[in-house]
C-alpha cells in the first residue's frame, strides 16, 4: 500500500506539466501585446514627444522582462519539479538550463520582480505631475518592500548554502 501511495504521489508531479505549458500561452499573449504596441506607435512616432516615446519604450521593456520571467519559471520549474528537458545535442541549449535549483529560481524571480517594479516606478516618475502624492508614496513603499524582500531572500539563501 505504501509503495502504491508513493508512486502515485511521485507521478502527480506531472499535473504541473500542463500548467508550465499554459505559461507559454501567456508568453504568446505578451508577444501579441508587444507587437500591438509597436504597430500602434509606428504611424505616430514622428508626432510623439520624447517623454511619450520613453514611456512606450519602458512599457516594452516591462513586457520583455515579464516574458523573460515567464520563460525562466517555465523551464526551470519544469526541470526542478517535473522532468529534465531532453533537448538534443544538435539544438541550442540555454546555458542556465539544469543549473537553477528552487532557491536560485526564487532569487532570480525576486530580482526580476524588482526590475519590473523599477520600470513601473520610472514610468510613474516620468509622469509625476499627473499622479497624486499618495499614490506615489504607495508605489515607493511597495517597491521598497520588493527590494528588501529580494535582499532578504538572497541573504538567507547565501546563509543556508554555507
Curated annotation (Swiss-Prot):
It is found in: Cell membrane. Coiled coil: none annotated. The chain crosses the membrane at residues 15-35, 53-73, 108-128, 136-156. GO terms for cellular component: plasma membrane. InterPro entries: UPF0114, UPF0114_bac. The keyword Transit peptide does not apply. Keywords: Cell membrane, Membrane, Transmembrane, Transmembrane helix. It is a multi-pass membrane protein. Its main location: membrane. Pfam families: UPF0114. HAMAP family: UPF0114. Belongs to the UPF0114 family. This is UPF0114 protein Shewana3_0644.
